[in-house]
Amino acid sequence: MRKLVVGSRRSKLALTQSQQFIDKLKAVEPNLEIEIKEIVTKGDRIVDKQLSKVGGKGLFVKEIQHELFEKNIDMAIHSLKDVPSVIPEGLTLGCIPDRELPFDAYISKTHTPLSQLPEGSIIGTSSLRRGAQILSKYPNLEIKWIRGNIDTRLEKLQTEDYDAIILAAAGLRRMGWSDDIVTSYLDRDTLLPAIGQGALGIECRSDDEELLTLLSKVHNDEVAKCVTAERTFLAEMDGSCQVPIAGYATISDQKEIEFTGLIMTPDGKERFEYTMNGTDPVELGKKVSNKLKEQGAYEIIKRLNEQH
């Protein structure tokens, strides 16, 4: 096997999860020589604005995909939730490895449970999806935007006027933070995850047969089916970063995929949700999308997209 070059964002989390995946590859192919090339993306350069206001999807992957096309790197290790639902022609997701915990972590400054926060308490989040779902269940709380890496957000929780923050559990776990700092992990009924949350997507060139064969050794087919249902739903709903959209699939003991899709307004006042079971992930994602469109969810999406 030739020497491989992996493209990664420069953030601590991106580099850590890249190294963790490389270790997984080396466990099945010990003699691999792999180098990490750090790439700064547009999303990394914009630190003072809400991402949904500056183009959302693709902000963390376009520069990396360019490096793949130029053959400066052989593969890219993405957080799957950052990857747009349509992959450019000539590239492919060559592998979906094991999924980390897909839920969100709620961290309170005073360890107060979410359901017991006093009226007017301020919750920091970087996501419309989280904000909308929290306001839907707890309209007496206030959402305030927070940006930055995990360390920055934890510091802001202590030094600024946030009473709590919500962030992806997967990032905390991959960075080695212990469960002790988490007040609670929010289950799917409290906060449905983002599309692909907790999963990695390993992107490479579609014609790189040698690499695709290697990647197949660490591919998790069940996780791939789940995220395919989720990402199909995202593509069908034409979900952009202006739209609070969530979707989560699991596989039952009967080997059926159960998928829940959710569309909301940012203020949490309008909510469209549907759950369905099936065996074909693409068909399932499309069916749930069609159900939500029948309920009127697509009108919300069009309205929100037009506003931006």
Curated annotation (Swiss-Prot):
Pfam families: Porphobil_deam, Porphobil_deamC
Known cofactor(s): dipyrromethane
The keyword Transferase appears for this protein: yes
Co-factor binding comment: Binds 1 dipyrromethane group covalently.
EC number: 2.5.1.61
A single MF term (Gene Ontology): hydroxymethylbilane synthase activity
GO terms (BP aspect): protoporphyrinogen IX biosynthetic process
Pathway: Porphyrin-containing compound metabolism; protoporphyrin-IX biosynthesis; coproporphyrinogen-III from 5-aminolevulinate: step 2/4
SUPFAM superfamilies: Periplasmic binding protein-like II, Porphobilinogen deaminase (hydroxymethylbilane synthase), C-terminal domain
GO CC annotations on file: cytoplasm
Enzymatic reactions: 4 porphobilinogen + H2O = hydroxymethylbilane + 4 NH4(+)
Swiss-Prot/TrEMBL keywords: Porphyrin biosynthesis, Transferase
Listed HAMAP family: Porphobil_deam
Homology family: Belongs to the HMBS family.
Quaternary context: Monomer.
Protein name according to UniProt: Porphobilinogen deaminase
Species this chain originates from: Staphylococcus aureus (strain MRSA252)
Encoding gene (name): hemC
